[in-house]
Each structure stands twice: as structure tokens, then as C-alpha cells.
């Protein structure tokens, strides 16, 4: 299902001046990301500000996004929550949208189940929603971490097709080694891109691809062609820039860069604040330029 899908953009949700979804900006950005070499998308993830979207907004966003992509690359849509039944119900709605091939389901946050509870949650969602599921393990945001043994157990479930893993390279390597060959493992940490694919992961679910898509595409292609010197050089150049995009609560930094480049993606919704002028200048410095408008989006 995710063969040859190595660069997935966890795409932002553009807003207009009234903080309504800006579908014109979304279409323009989507086409650009495909042009830069993206081979898949996550819509409605963390970077997409899902917690600030209403149910109706999510359905409208996913439907329109699938129309924009028009089958060019696979789409995975966020449906997860800390309510198992609500996750099932929403996944059933989303599976009706043509072009969406799987649901991204995050570990249950706030109520913090134990490992047995997480197994029960994901198995119940996968079976009752009857739709391919990509698990999303991001303990830095959820307050709960799914252990490797739990993930390995869940990887045997037919409808659970993979994981977006936001922990460390040791975990990535363990999961690649101990899950079925058709279970897709993606790092959700941009600076781990080269390390993850070197360990056998499918690729990266990226935020930095909004800005450095050409470079990440070149890095992944260099690995495929066995040019590790080139891949290593690109990763070394990209890592501090990738880290800089998380200096402030995401997706505020990436939106600031895109707005400076006239992509008109708007501000984040509260509780995330847009960057102030001092923060923009600091971000530009960390990205190696004087102003965010100077960031080069082409490679």
C-alpha cells in the first residue's frame, strides 16, 4: 500500500485572515509539494492543527484535499482521538472519501492508558472501522509512549499497516527488524531522515519538506543510489534547519517561512501564536539567512 512512498509531507492547514480554511492556498501548496518530490501526504495531523478544527471542517478539508491531490499520491488522514468509539465513528466517515487510503490514529492522550489499553484501543479501531490504520506514536505531545513490544504486537493486526514513530533511531531500528516486511515504519522526526532510511525504514513523515522538499528528495534519492557521502552531506546541512523549524510551537515557524515566501498560509489558530518580529529574525538567523524571505525553497 505504501510501496515507494518515502517522503510524506504532514501538510499544514492554511487559513485566511478570518482563520477560515484557505482552500486556494492549500491547492497551490499541495501542487508545489508534489512538484518537489513528495510521494504522499498526511492531512489533519499535528502540523495540520487538527485539535483546532471542527468535525465539519475536518470532513470538508479531507474531501477537498482528496480532490486537489486527485490520486497523484496516497493520502493518510488523521482520525485519532482519546475516545475509542469517536475514533471508530470518524474513521468510518473518512473511509468514504475517495483518495484517502488510510487513517492516522494517534495514541490516546490525556487519559493515558497502559500498554494493554493501547493494544485494545488500536485493535478495536482497526477491526470495527475496517480501514487501514497508521499508528502515530508521539510521546512528546501525548504524554504517553507506546512501547516497542506493543507496536510489534499490533503490527500483526491485518488492518494496521504502519507507524509514524516520533521517538529515536534505536526504536526505529528495532521496529524495522521485528515487524512484518509489509509493515511501514516512518520516522516523524526530520533530523532522523537519513538514519531512519539507513536502518531500513520506509521514509520520513516530514514538516521540513514544506521548505526543504527538494533537498530531502535529493537525500532520499542519494540513499537509493548508494551515494551515502551525498546523503550525509545533505543531512548535515539540513539538520540544524530542521531543528530550527521547531524552535517555537509548530506549525508557527513553518507558516512564518511560507508566508514570507508569499504562500499566504495565514496564522496558526489559538492556542498557537504566530511568530513575532523578534522570533522571525531569530528563526531566519537559525536558517542561515537575514530574513525569512531569503530562504531558498529550490535546490
Curated annotation (Swiss-Prot):
InterPro entries: Aldolase_TIM, DapA, DapA-like, Schiff_base-form_aldolases_AS
GO molecular function: 4-hydroxy-tetrahydrodipicolinate synthase activity
GO cellular component: cytosol
Subcellular location as annotated: Cytoplasm
Binding site for pyruvate: 47, 205
Site (Part of a proton relay during catalysis): 46, 110
Pathway: Amino-acid biosynthesis; L-lysine biosynthesis via DAP pathway; (S)-tetrahydrodipicolinate from L-aspartate: step 3/4
Keyword terms, alphabetized: Amino-acid biosynthesis, Cytoplasm, Diaminopimelate biosynthesis, Lyase, Lysine biosynthesis, Schiff base
Annotated active site: 136, 164
Top class in the EC scheme: lyase
Catalysed reactions, as listed in the record: L-aspartate 4-semialdehyde + pyruvate = (2S,4S)-4-hydroxy-2,3,4,5-tetrahydrodipicolinate + H2O + H(+)
Assigned EC number: 4.3.3.7
GO biological process, one term: lysine biosynthetic process via diaminopimelate
CDD domains hit by this protein: DHDPS
UniProt record similarity statement: Belongs to the DapA family.
Function description: Catalyzes the condensation of (S)-aspartate-beta-semialdehyde [(S)-ASA] and pyruvate to 4-hydroxy-tetrahydrodipicolinate (HTPA).
Subunit structure: Homotetramer; dimer of dimers.
Protein name: 4-hydroxy-tetrahydrodipicolinate synthase
The organism of origin for this protein: Pediococcus pentosaceus (strain ATCC 25745 / CCUG 21536 / LMG 10740 / 183-1w)
Amino acid at each position: 500500500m505504501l510501496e515507494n512512498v518515502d517522503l510524506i509531507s504532514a501538510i499544514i492547514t492554511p487559513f485566511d485572515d478570518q482563520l477560515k480554511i484557505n482552500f486556494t492556498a492549500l491547492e497551490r501548496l499541495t501542487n508545489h509539494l508534489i512538484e518537489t518530490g513528495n510521494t504522499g501526504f498526511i492531512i489533519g495531523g499535528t502540523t495540520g492543527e487538527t485539535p483546532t478544527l471542527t468535525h465539519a471542517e475536518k470532513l470538508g478539508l479531507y474531501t477537498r484535499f482528496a480532490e486537489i491531490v486527485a490520486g497523484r499520491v496516497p493520502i493518510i488522514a488523521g482520525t485519532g482521538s482519546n475516545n475509542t468509539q469517536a475514533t471508530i465513528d470518524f474513521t468510518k466517515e473518512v473511509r468514504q472519501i475517495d483518495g484517502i487510503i488510510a487513517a492516522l490514529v494517534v495514541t490516546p492522550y490525556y487519559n493515558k492508558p497502559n500498554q494493554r489499553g493501547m493494544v485494545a484501543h488500536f485493535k478495536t479501531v482497526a477491526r470495527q472501522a475496517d480501514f487501514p490504520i497508521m499508528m502515530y506514536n508521539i510521546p512528546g505531545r501525548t504524554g504517553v509512549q507506546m512501547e516497542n513490544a506493543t507496536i510489534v504486537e499490533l503490527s500483526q493486526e491485518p488492518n494496521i499497516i504502519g507507524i509514524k514513530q516520533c521517538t529515536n533511531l534505536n526504536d526505529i531500528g528495532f521496529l524495522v527488524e521485528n515487524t512484518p516486511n509489509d509493515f511501514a515504519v516512518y520516522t516523524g522526526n526530520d533530523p532522523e531522515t537519513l538514519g531512519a532510511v539507513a536502518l531500513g525504514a520506509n521514509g520520513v513523515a516530514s514538516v521540513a519538506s514544506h521548505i526543504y522538499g527538494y533537498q530531502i528528495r535529493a537525500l532520499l534519492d542519494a540513499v537509493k543510489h548508494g551515494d551515502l557521502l551525498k546523503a550525509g552531506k545533505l543531512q548535515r546541512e539540513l539538520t540544524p534547519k530542521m531543528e530550527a523549524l521547531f524552535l517555537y510551537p509548530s506549525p508557527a515557524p513553518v507558516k512564518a517561512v511560507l508566508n514570507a515566501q508569499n504562500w499566504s498560509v495565514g496564522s496558526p489558530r489559538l492556542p498557537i501564536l504566530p511568530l513575532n518580529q523578534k522570533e522571525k529574525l531569530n528563526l531566519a538567523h537559525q536558517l542561515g539567512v537575514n530574513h525569512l524571505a531569503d530562504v531558498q525553497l529550490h535546490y
